[in-house]
Amino acid sequence: DLFADFCDPGFEQKETLSTGAMVAAAGGYTDAFVIPNTNPPTSSKTAVEYIKNENDLVNLFPIGSVSKNIEGKDLAEMYDMKLAGAIAFSDGRKTIQNSGLLLKALQYVKTFEGIIIEIPEDREITKNGLMNEGVVSTQIGLQAKASIAEDIHTYRNIELLRYTQSKIHLTGISTKKSIDLIRQAKKQKLNVTCSVTTYHLLYSEQMLESYNSHFKVNPPLRTEEDRKALIKAVEDGTIDCIASHHTPQSWDDKQVEFAYAQSGMLSLQTTLHMLLKLESNITIDKWVSLLSDQPRKIFSLPQPKLEAGADATLTIFSTTEPWTYNEKSNQSLSENSPLFQETLQGKILCVINNHKHRIYE
């Protein structure tokens, strides 16, 4: 997985590196990229090493911050973090608003073939918004975030990429317009890749009619037209990978009035179920590629080999076996999933990696 929040250090009541790795394994993952939105943020060599030291059954790859302490002002010591083991660079959920800073970052990482990961969002447009702007937000009377905030930054990021000829990965893509812009940029042979979450593929803004804060995410759930455009983009190869955007939130952060609830959803452990629920023409082989081969290719990680004598990196799963997602099976310290207490189809049976394995009964 290439975009997960494990909250450690600083917010260990929600998740730790250890529990986050357990959640990832239970979701069938052998590798997870950890975003830098911690306290202190992953802005130094020491912070990168702190995450790297947790490698066990699941390999944790730190994403170093682009700006010092994710403040969006000055560039962080990205090359030092790269040498210490940072897989890529991003300000995570705190998207880069300063175009000059992003321009410098793209130029800088190009010198060592680094990659910037960015969620496209103009926060001046989305501030105070609680959900997607559209018919549903009008009907239920919630302040909204216009999808143009994503589209503008997708366009900006692509143009900065064109100017620098660097590498960027856009994640959390949620609008039809953004997908169209990325598709066009790829045709022009720009080095842009992108990922989408399982919940943006599965759910639309209609889920918020009940004011269920578990569906409050950022980028927000969009229109049914956007959702279908995302599925089409997976089918035609415009979308390169699936990213979990796993965001643990404590009970107190979610069980409040919708306006005050924090954004985010647990999603690592339920990836398989959510993809199997999707009505699409996408084969299970294609999903596996979007979750494993493609991210490894983009971020220059070795592809595991299934042959005699090779180290096994394997996930064994059933597409039909049911399991109940509850306090007993949940590996996270948080419970903020709309699927909690439900019986789900599609079960991870065993994960093998780093000469270790875990079997799920």
Predicted regions and their residues:
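Metal-associated gating/positioning segment near the N- to mid-region
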Residues: D1-N55
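Active-site mouth loops of central-metabolism enzymes
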Residues: L2-E15, P36-T38, F61-D74, L142-I148
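Divalent metal-coordination and catalytic microenvironments
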Residues: F3, A24, G28, L60, ...
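Short, acidic/polar
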Residues: Q13-A21, I70-M81, R156-N157
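Alpha-helix-loop-beta-strand connector modules within alpha/beta enzyme cores
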Residues: K45-I63, Q107-E121, T270-M274
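Histidine/acidic residue-rich metal-binding segments in metalloenzymes
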Residues: A76-I242
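His/Asp/Glu-enriched, well-ordered alpha-helical/loop segment
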Residues: Q139-K167, E235-D236, D240-I242, T247-F317
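C-terminal cap of metal-dependent C-N hydrolases
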Residues: Y260, D311-E361
